[in-house]
């Protein structure tokens, strides 16, 4: 017998996004397989209009797919519905959204808060 879980990203219960300890206003998540201790796994991230992520560094690869809305990176690149984005280890950035967005995120390591330089 298989162990299977089906996730509907539009109808799941979301909790405040607290991956850095303190919840970030306007950001919430639904963990699918994500392990906060190892930073590995998958989660759905919801950002309300006007939400902004903390500036952080990727210790390993992170990939995500924009399921809905759009996300604007610190360098003003705009990621739209259907875009698949990859951040390599050592990448540093923050992102924000004007309209709100829903993102399916695949993590391979813990992101750590960083200073803007």
Regions found by a protein language model. Give the residues of each.
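Short glycine/proline-enriched turns and hinge-like loops at secondary-structure junctions
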Residues: 57-59, 77-78, 97-99
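Glycine- and acidic-residue-biased ligand/ion/polar-headgroup-sensing regions
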Residues: 49, 58-74
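A short, N-terminal "cap"/entry segment at the start of jelly-roll beta-barrel domains
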Residues: 1-39
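Conserved short histidine dyad/triad with adjacent acidic residue
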Residues: 28-58, 88-92
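Ligand-binding loop in jelly-roll beta-barrel domains
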Residues: 89-114
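Short acidic-glycine-tyrosine-enriched beta hairpin
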Residues: 73-93
């Amino acid at each position: 017998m298989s162990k299977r879980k089906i996730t509907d990203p539009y109808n799941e219960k979301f909790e405040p996004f607290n991956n850095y300890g303190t919840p970030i206003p306007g950001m919430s998540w639904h963990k699918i397989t994500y392990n906060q201790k190892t930073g590995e796994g998958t989660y759905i991230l919801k950002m309300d209009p006007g939400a902004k992520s903390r500036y952080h560094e990727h210790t390993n690869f992170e990939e995500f797919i924009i399921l809905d809305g759009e996300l604007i990176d610190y360098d003003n690149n705009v990621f739209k519905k259907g875009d698949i984005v990859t951040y390599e280890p050592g990448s540093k950035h923050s992102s924000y959204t004007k309209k709100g967005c829903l993102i399916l995120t695949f993590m391979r390591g813990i992101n750590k808060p960083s200073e803007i330089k």
